[in-house]
Amino acid sequence: MPSIARLPDNVANKISAGEVVQRPASVVKELLENAIDSGADRISVVIKDAGRELVRIIDNGRGMSRADALLSVERFATSKLRDVDDLDTLGTLGFRGEALASISSVSHFELRTRMTDAPVALRFRYEGGIAVEESEVQGEAGTSVSVRNLFYNVPARRKFLKSNATEYGHIFELVRSFSLAYPEIQWQLLNDDQELFNFRTSDMLERLDTFYGKGFADSLIEVGEENDYLSIRGYIGRPALQKRKKLDQYFFINRRPIQNRMLTQALQQAYAELLVERQAPFALLFLGIDPSRVDVNVHPAKLEVRFDDERSVRNMFYPVIKRAVTLHDFSPDLAAGGRTSQAGDDSASRGFTHAGGGGFRTLAFQEVPERAITTGELYGSYREGAFGSSRPAVPQPSHQEVMFPVPEVPAAREDISQLLRSSMHEGPEGAGVEPKGEEPKIWQLHNKYLICQIKTGLMIIDQHVAHERVLYERAVEVMESRVPNSQQLLFPQKVEFRPWEYEVFEEIKDDLYRLGFNLRSFGTRAVMIEGVPQDVRPGSEATIMQDMIAEYRENATRLRLERRDNLAKSYSCRNAIMAGQKLSMGEMRTLIDNLFATREPYSCPHGRPVIIKMTLTELDHMFGRS
């Protein structure tokens, strides 16, 4: 007698269920895909006991004939394809034909279905994959699938389910994802007889507000671009919406929910320094591509896909997101304002154009046209890394006669400066424009924040992180140029390092020289500081050096930053003016000038906000003015 035997169908189905059905959310996913593929425009999801007791999906799709209904519960029976080549033109979510067979083998399974022209509905019941009843019943057109007592006959699987809160959380996240991917479908979710949502319209922003709170959609940026290979559309969030986890990042390929490491990494890199460490931006992005150029049959749960040319996808995806991020004003509002990306009303949300000299009076305090940055420039920065040569130029530091040297106005921006200077006093009476000849109002609050009157209300700037942003970009530019900008000390300063400090010093000493530090070895684990960058405060040279090394080591341990990026961040953090330091009016004005000459004036290198704005409309609302 042979030792190898063919497994009975019910045993094979139970084994297959181990891959297809991992938890109640897996059941929901497979049944929702079938409901969507049936052409339904109304789907209800009913859950009890986090899916352990009941999962029921009701749709108003095409329904099935008796023959199709019986075949649907057989393994490898599907209406989605006939040949392996059909995978190249697949337009459905499901295609393997094993979901219902696997689900019915580990549950008490009931299928009700009626085609539009059928007089009655058909009802089929299965227990552990074995048919136990077939009957005719009254019912509406469409299909209803009920899955009770999941894993009742596989106690080991049932035992390893998580808490109700965890299992229900997976179900809710799944239904939310599908409801965002298919706004044309009316979605209803009931959990333990409580209705959680019932969407009757196709308004995507209304759904986002329902899921994330009123006003959430106001903090989104719309994205849309396409070429012959790929289309990208959807929404990304302001940095204020950043999350601890990546659960609120939705990627859809031809409206199929997927997970893709390349897309996640490119999204994170596009935001770069706008994010606080370990935070992730919100994203709801739909990618459209020829089905023949993407393989969806690479994961048991169909969550992963493989592109035939991943490089081309990445090369288009990153610049589109980077452009949307770069052209937008990410300064947070103190209260919820208007929608941030509306056609015809985005001048107030596009951000400040780089300024210099006296430019803050005409640029920082006015609403300006968006920055013109090409896709080529954006892709160049992605391709070449954080210190590539294609980055937009950052103004070179000037002399050290003031605390914050004023950068020169780039020639390409002089026209914008002139335009805004000429229009500065043309606003209507009461519009918040300064009278001709008056300087914009600036106040220092508790020697920590700068409060500025702007055309639309007021702006609050954190002086420490603002200076940190200025110093960071200046340090990056100096190290890229490899032309040290050093000021020699009249009296060199000696620094003695501890062993670990000296190890770090040896690692970064070449980049310290590029940054502007002129250093000479002086005995064992000691150096003489003979020159420093022009931004280093007199008398703080030795302290700054040791603080930088400590900061560098901490960043290397926690964040694993690229060496020069780490050094630039350590230098700017330790050398920036501190909260509590009083500034003169000239220093405040110069700091603002320098801030708005940077590429990213809205966040410090570590992702903290630099600017918060409050509009007159918000103030009027708080004081009860109509």
From Swiss-Prot:
The keyword DNA repair applies. SMART domains: DNA_mis_repair, MutL_C. Coiled coil: none annotated. GO terms for molecular function: ATP binding; ATP hydrolysis activity; ATP-dependent DNA damage sensor activity; mismatched DNA binding. GO terms for cellular component: mismatch repair complex. PROSITE patterns: DNA_MISMATCH_REPAIR_1. Disulfide bonds: none annotated. GO terms for biological process: mismatch repair. Keywords: DNA damage, DNA repair. PANTHER family: DNA MISMATCH REPAIR PROTEIN MLH, PMS, MUTL (PTHR10073), DNA MISMATCH REPAIR PROTEIN MLH1 (PTHR10073:SF12). Belongs to the DNA mismatch repair MutL/HexB family. This protein is involved in the repair of mismatches in DNA. It is required for dam-dependent methyl-directed DNA mismatch repair. May act as a 'molecular matchmaker', a protein that promotes the formation of a stable complex between two or more DNA-binding proteins in an ATP-dependent manner without itself being part of a final effector complex. This is DNA mismatch repair protein MutL. It comes from Chlorobium luteolum (strain DSM 273 / BCRC 81028 / 2530) (Pelodictyon luteolum).
